[in-house]
Amino acid sequence: HYEMGWKHFMNSGQCEVSVYYKTRRNVLALRPDTWVEDEGWQKYLMVGNGDSYGVKGYLYQRWKRWSLQLSYAYSRSREWFGELPEKGKVPSLYDVPHQLGGALSYQLTTHSSFSVGGMLRSGKVRFLNEDYEPLSVEEFREKREPLNYRVDVGYSYRKSFGDKLLLLRLGVYTVVGKLYEEDILSFYSVHWSGNCLPYGSLSFKF
């Protein structure tokens, strides 16, 4: 793993940039066009190697009552397998080339603020087709999910009572957006239409 970066502190914020490169050995993957029928995993797995690299940037800036955060990452994760020399280096299942995030906040009072945030990500690599069947050798690691994005809104209230602290957070995830299907199945137990999810928390530190 190799990584290097640069950080700069400004009067009312900071910015930073970093680059990295990683190598991976003995990567496991299911062979293309394979149905798992028993516990003999050795029959279904192939072994290879991989690497990943990327560049990440972050900006935070305040202007009076406003604050802005922006982040962007370009990253690639690749794998190659001796059993598939014709495919060369293919994207890994964790390959998400572009990730963009941002949040804009406005301080309503000395204790409260309102925020709008969002993110945009490339689609994940598919390992099953539209009929949930294994992909063929020709289609192996060639297809992606659609672009993933969402916009959230939130309100926070923070009040100190001597050495005690009260923190209230309210908001809505995915006011508009399109999420990964597994994100919806894994994390959304209560939601409105369009996978819109309300949230709230009340914390008291003493």
Where are the language model's segments positioned?
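Residue-level detector of short, conserved catalytic/binding motifs and their immediate flanks
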Residues: Y2, V55, V153
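Conserved C-terminal beta-signal and adjacent last beta-strands/turns
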Residues: P91-F206
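Membrane-embedded beta-barrel scaffold of Gram-negative outer-membrane proteins
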Residues: H1-M46, D51, W66, E79, ...
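Gram-negative outer-membrane beta-barrel transporters
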Residues: V19-T23, W41-E130
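Short acidic, gly/pro-rich beta-turn/loop elements at beta-sheet edges
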Residues: Q14-E16, V27-A29, D33, S67-Q69, ...
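A generic beta-sheet turn/junction motif
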Residues: H8-S12, Q61-R65, K159-D163, F206
